[in-house]
Protein backbone atom coordinates (compact mmCIF):
# COMPACT_ATOMS: atom_id res chain seq x y z
CA UNK A 1 0.00 0.00 0.00
CA UNK A 2 1.21 3.50 -0.82
CA UNK A 3 2.34 5.96 1.79
CA UNK A 4 -0.23 8.76 1.57
CA UNK A 5 1.49 10.99 4.10
CA UNK A 6 4.19 12.12 1.67
CA UNK A 7 3.01 13.98 -1.43
CA UNK A 8 3.73 12.56 -4.86
CA UNK A 9 5.79 14.93 -6.93
CA UNK A 10 5.48 15.31 -10.70
CA UNK A 11 6.73 17.63 -13.41
CA UNK A 12 4.25 20.11 -14.84
CA UNK A 13 4.49 22.66 -17.64
CA UNK A 14 2.73 26.00 -17.64
CA UNK A 15 1.54 28.09 -20.57
CA UNK A 16 5.03 29.49 -21.10
CA UNK A 17 6.54 26.00 -21.39
CA UNK A 18 8.33 26.34 -18.07
CA UNK A 19 8.69 23.14 -16.12
CA UNK A 20 8.11 23.11 -12.40
CA UNK A 21 7.51 20.53 -9.73
CA UNK A 22 3.95 20.03 -8.56
CA UNK A 23 2.72 17.71 -5.88
CA UNK A 24 -0.29 15.46 -5.49
CA UNK A 25 -1.98 15.26 -2.12
CA UNK A 26 -4.23 12.52 -0.85
CA UNK A 27 -7.77 13.54 0.07
CA UNK A 28 -9.09 11.14 2.71
CA UNK A 29 -12.71 12.11 2.08
CA UNK A 30 -12.85 11.21 -1.60
CA UNK A 31 -10.12 8.54 -1.82
CA UNK A 32 -8.57 10.31 -4.78
CA UNK A 33 -5.32 12.08 -5.41
CA UNK A 34 -5.74 15.71 -6.43
CA UNK A 35 -3.11 18.24 -7.47
CA UNK A 36 -2.23 20.67 -4.70
CA UNK A 37 -3.19 23.65 -6.89
CA UNK A 38 -6.77 22.32 -6.98
CA UNK A 39 -7.19 22.54 -3.22
CA UNK A 40 -10.43 24.28 -2.40
CA UNK A 41 -12.17 23.22 -5.60
CA UNK A 42 -13.76 20.16 -4.01
CA UNK A 43 -17.06 21.99 -3.55
CA UNK A 44 -17.14 23.29 -7.12
CA UNK A 45 -19.91 21.64 -9.17
CA UNK A 46 -19.48 22.29 -12.90
CA UNK A 47 -21.98 19.57 -13.83
CA UNK A 48 -25.65 20.48 -13.31
CA UNK A 49 -27.47 18.63 -10.59
CA UNK A 50 -29.64 15.66 -11.66
CA UNK A 51 -32.83 17.66 -11.00
CA UNK A 52 -31.88 20.10 -13.77
CA UNK A 53 -33.03 18.79 -17.13
CA UNK A 54 -31.86 19.85 -20.55
CA UNK A 55 -35.26 21.38 -21.34
CA UNK A 56 -35.10 23.62 -18.29
CA UNK A 57 -31.55 24.63 -19.21
CA UNK A 58 -32.73 25.38 -22.75
CA UNK A 59 -35.66 27.44 -21.52
CA UNK A 60 -33.37 29.30 -19.11
CA UNK A 61 -30.93 30.04 -21.93
CA UNK A 62 -33.74 31.14 -24.24
CA UNK A 63 -35.16 33.42 -21.56
CA UNK A 64 -31.74 34.98 -20.96
CA UNK A 65 -31.16 35.52 -24.68
CA UNK A 66 -34.59 37.15 -25.08
CA UNK A 67 -33.88 39.40 -22.12
CA UNK A 68 -30.53 40.46 -23.60
CA UNK A 69 -32.17 41.08 -26.99
CA UNK A 70 -34.82 43.27 -25.37
CA UNK A 71 -32.15 45.27 -23.54
CA UNK A 72 -30.19 45.72 -26.77
CA UNK A 73 -33.35 46.87 -28.58
CA UNK A 74 -34.02 49.44 -25.88
CA UNK A 75 -30.43 50.66 -26.02
CA UNK A 76 -30.57 50.80 -29.81
CA UNK A 77 -33.79 52.83 -29.78
CA UNK A 78 -32.21 55.36 -27.46
CA UNK A 79 -29.01 55.60 -29.48
CA UNK A 80 -30.53 56.06 -32.96
CA UNK A 81 -30.26 59.84 -32.78
CA UNK A 82 -26.49 59.48 -33.09
CA UNK A 83 -26.85 57.88 -36.51
CA UNK A 84 -29.42 60.20 -38.07
CA UNK A 85 -26.71 62.57 -39.25
CA UNK A 86 -25.17 59.74 -41.27
CA UNK A 87 -28.33 59.20 -43.32
CA UNK A 88 -28.25 61.44 -46.42
CA UNK A 89 -31.24 63.55 -47.36
CA UNK A 90 -33.51 62.25 -50.12
CA UNK A 91 -32.44 65.04 -52.47
CA UNK A 92 -28.83 63.92 -52.11
CA UNK A 93 -29.69 60.40 -53.26
CA UNK A 94 -31.33 61.43 -56.56
CA UNK A 95 -28.91 61.16 -59.48
CA UNK A 96 -28.80 64.15 -61.75
CA UNK A 97 -30.31 63.41 -65.11
CA UNK A 98 -27.87 65.18 -67.42
CA UNK A 99 -29.15 63.61 -70.63
CA UNK A 100 -32.64 65.14 -70.31
CA UNK A 101 -31.33 68.63 -69.62
CA UNK A 102 -28.98 68.45 -72.61
CA UNK A 103 -25.85 68.95 -70.54
CA UNK A 104 -22.79 66.86 -71.12
CA UNK A 105 -22.34 64.05 -68.60
CA UNK A 106 -19.71 64.85 -66.03
CA UNK A 107 -16.60 62.76 -65.77
CA UNK A 108 -16.38 60.74 -62.63
CA UNK A 109 -13.63 61.81 -60.31
CA UNK A 110 -11.34 59.02 -59.29
CA UNK A 111 -10.77 58.37 -55.66
CA UNK A 112 -7.06 57.83 -56.28
CA UNK A 113 -6.14 60.03 -59.28
CA UNK A 114 -2.46 59.09 -59.33
CA UNK A 115 -3.25 55.39 -59.52
CA UNK A 116 -5.87 55.79 -62.24
CA UNK A 117 -4.22 58.52 -64.34
CA UNK A 118 -2.86 56.07 -66.91
CA UNK A 119 -6.36 54.68 -67.55
CA UNK A 120 -8.34 57.91 -67.83
CA UNK A 121 -6.45 59.36 -70.83
Curated annotation (Swiss-Prot):
Name of the protein: Structural protein p14.5
Biased composition (Basic residues): 104-121
Places the protein is found: Virion
Keyword line: Acetylation, DNA-binding, Host-virus interaction, Inhibition of host innate immune response by virus, Inhibition of host IRF3 by virus, Inhibition of host RLR pathway by virus, Late protein, Viral immunoevasion, Viral release from host cell, Virion
GO BP term, example: symbiont-mediated suppression of host cytoplasmic pattern recognition receptor signaling pathway via inhibition of IRF3 activity
Role played: Structural protein required for transport of intracellular particles from the assembly sites to the plasma membrane. Binds to both ssDNA and dsDNA. Suppressed the activation of the cGAS/STING pathway by interfering with the recruitment of IRF3 to TBK1, which in turn suppresses IRF3 phosphorylation, decreasing interferon production.
A GO molecular-function annotation: DNA binding
Location of the region described as Disordered in the Swiss-Prot/TrEMBL record: 1-24, 84-121
Quaternary structure annotation from Swiss-Prot or TrEMBL: Interacts with the major capsid protein. Interacts with host IRF3; this interaction interferes with the recruitment of IRF3 to TBK1.
Induction / repression: Expressed in the late phase of the viral replicative cycle.
Magnesium in keyword set: no
Family classification: Belongs to the asfivirus structural protein p14.5 family.
Post-translational modification: Acetylated.
Organism: African swine fever virus (isolate Tick/South Africa/Pretoriuskop Pr4/1996)
Superkingdom, natural source: Viruses
Residues recorded as bearing N-acetylalanine in the entry: 2
Amino acid sequence: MADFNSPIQYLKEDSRDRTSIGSLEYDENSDTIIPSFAAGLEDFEPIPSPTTTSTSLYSQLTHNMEKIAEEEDINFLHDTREFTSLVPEETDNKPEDDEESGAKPKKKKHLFPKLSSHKSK
